[in-house]
Amino acid sequence: MDKLLERFLHYVSLDTQSKSGVRQVPSTEGQWKLLRLLKQQLEEMGLVNITLSEKGTLMATLPANVEGDIPAIGFISHVDTSPDFSGKNVNPQIVENYRGGDIALGIGDEVLSPVMFPVLHQLLGQTLITTDGKTLLGADDKAGVAEIMTALAVLKGNPIPHGEIKVAFTPDEEVGKGAKHFDVEAFGAQWAYTVDGGGVGELEFENFNAASVNIKIVGNNVHPGTAKGVMVNALSLAARIHAEVPADEAPETTEGYEGFYHLASMKGTVDRAEMHYIIRDFDRKQFEARKRKMMEIAKKVGKGLHPDCYIELVIEDSYYNMREKVVEHPHILDIAQQAMRDCHITPEMKPIRGGTDGAQLSFMGLPCPNLFTGGYNYHGKHEFVTLEGMEKAVQVIVRIAELTAKRGQ
């Protein structure tokens, strides 16, 4: 455990922010730097079958130290950080023995406040690692990376019985490409866990069904003084489209198992406009209904337009709720829950209001629920992680390996 914090601070010092709209994978050079560093560290640790694919997926194996019919299991984290907020020149602050109240982030006016983030009340006495208010931290998911690497070191250096352990580090998870080039067969695990969750105890096996909706609107621009009966304002059509989308089904008005429509971006002129929505829902039927709703809205608003003016809508599914795949293998969750209880942690089963690589991998034949990392407030300047939470995550990973070995002996 002594190197856990050291590893984490080293990893977050590297700018691995991914970039959307880029064809190449990984989308940024910084991710390669961390992947090559991890490859070197895995080699120094003595793991075998270490491969780094041309698409930036790093895999390695810790051989079993006991005999028996023990299934190979995996642990997976992603190396990129979110494009939503700067990940360059991350300058972590370490707050030991947190005593409550506001935490100043750097030398400006930014603070991490329990008024805005009440979870801080539960973390008194712990060591918090925060940002300096200028960048994100990168605990999503470098906390997971550091925890997996530390768990490997623990298993390697202690006589803890375990079967074959597979590990993988993926790029571009934050832009939805992390699992697209993942070779499940080459990985060779019967099941796996992503280490990409939040607070201590979180065990997630349900995530959104997700789709993107791109709308292109072509209008007709003429001089406003002679526009009557001729002008078709693409921006007005965009406004009408958004007015038809249920206002009470947006991210800012929903929680728990509630789905939403989210207008992520909009740009344009009188002549042309573009809108980008994302659709999310846990229920597959409701998910399909939301997609139909968007098509109906576009058809309604576009009715009666001049033939040269039109509304074009393209919907693409991004990923699906992994619940239907994971529940087919209940022992995967049973082992994780038992591991947490053995580490004096109360498992907290909650839905992911988002997605993970594990969602896609579960549909590729690798059931893959999500474990906590001990981090909070991802993708922004208020992101932080607790050292105690990270240590708990390492303990759970090690215990999962041990319990899996006992099942097979």
Curated annotation (Swiss-Prot):
Cofactor(s) essential for the protein: Zn(2+)
Cofactor, free-text remark: Binds 2 Zn(2+) ions per subunit.
InterPro entries associated with the record: ArgE/DapE_CS, Bact_exopeptidase_dim_dom, Peptidase_M20, Peptidase_M20_dimer, Peptidase_M20B
GO CC, alphabetical: cytosol
Binding site for Zn(2+) 1: 78, 140, 196
Enzyme class: hydrolase
Keywords: Aminopeptidase, Cytoplasm, Hydrolase, Metal-binding, Metalloprotease, Protease, Zinc
Family recorded in the similarity comment: Belongs to the peptidase M20B family.
Protein name (Swiss-Prot/TrEMBL): Peptidase T
Species the sequence originates in: Salmonella gallinarum (strain 287/91 / NCTC 13346)
Protein's gene: pepT
